[in-house]
Amino acid sequence: MELRVANANGSCENGSIVSLYCSSQEVLCQIVRGISPEEPYNATLITWQERVRKKYGFYIGVGLAFLSCFLIGTSVILKKKGLIRLVATGATRAVNGGYGYLKDPMWWAGMATMSAGEVANFGAYAFAPATVVTPLGALSVLISAIFSSYCLGESLNLLGKLGCVICMAGSTVMVIHAPKEEKVTTVAEMASKMKDTGFIVFAVLLVVSCLILIFIVAPRYGQRNILIYIIICSVIGSFSVTAVKGLGVTIRNFFQGLPVVRHPLPYILSLILGLSIIIQVNFLNRALDIFNTSLVFPIYYVFFTTVVVASSIVLFKEWYTMSAVDIVGTLSGFVTIILGVFMLHAFKDLDINQISLPHTHKNPTPAPAPEPTVIKLEDKNVLVDNIELASTPSPQQKPKVFMTDS
């Protein structure tokens, strides 16, 4: 069997027609993309990868975000149980600078689960915009709230369950209205955006505020105010998200055959990511050691998401290409998620369930106040008539005279 190739016009430019002859069969092919000898051998594979990414990349990113939420929500429970066991042994607590939890297998199981969740989160940021992946973290709040009621004995009443449903509704709205296209595709573009003056000023403000919280505010008020440790974790978390996003672009460019190994940005981002994870784990353990899990995680999610979305707006400018309807929809979804998280936390101590709900009544209307007793002053004639004599007065007794003023 002989295969012959013939070109009608003698040109190999894009759009040219090439004929393939095999025995008595003829096939006409059109050149869509030419590959020069200088291009890498996997250029055809790159084209296929790009087609798959453009068509399914957004949904792959959302799926990885859901998986990440499940793993991270579970890891919080495991780490909390490890910290509880540490307190039971009498060792130095994490909030007091102790690191005894490093010897607890339950805590390490939580760290392993969280690492797997972060890997899935890493992949999600590589495929989907940060304004989609980060708000979906509300589902990890939902998962931790459900598991904490079964594993840690923390109650989840009817309003808490309703808050979970509201979180899922808000996440769905955000996914529908979030930007589908990612504008940063190369390491050079990522480096150019990080050199932008607006992002540099924003990053400097975050670093300065974080240093003030760590070295001045946290030693004095960290054990009394839950917001101190959570704000530190949230601010540092925004840098970790930026680093993950940049490393995701680096990995894609590496498999596309682009020269990214010699670029300094991947190494800088790796250093930022490592430092961010260490600081986050340290202060998140302190918050979990003192405060309730159902209190720490929802508040942490709200602050973390707010800072990350602000960072995404400054760095990637993903919102600039969105329509007004999508912007309003995304903000509405985010506010809905915050309301759901608020319901999870604010009403967690109320004893409200499906059984007691029908018997819940409004406070009864208070009875009207009784009228004040009015003492009516009698006149002198009535007073005289009402005098009762104990007995008939004897002649020796002097008469009693009552004086009344008229």
Curated annotation (Swiss-Prot):
It catalyses: Mg(2+)(in) = Mg(2+)(out). GO terms for molecular function: magnesium ion transmembrane transporter activity. One of its GO terms (cellular component) is plasma membrane. The keyword Endoplasmic reticulum does not apply. Residues 1-57, 148-155, 219-225, 285-295, 348-406 are extracellular. Residues 79-126, 177-197, 247-263, 317-326 are cytoplasmic. Induction: Up-regulated by low magnesium ion levels. Acts as a Mg(2+) transporter. Can also transport other divalent cations such as Ba(2+), Sr(2+) and Fe(2+) but to a much less extent than Mg(2+). May be a receptor for ligands (trioxilins A3 and B3) from the hepoxilin pathway. Belongs to the NIPA family. This is Magnesium transporter NIPA4. It comes from Mus musculus. The lineage of its organism: Eukaryota, Metazoa, Chordata, Craniata, Vertebrata. The gene is Nipal4.
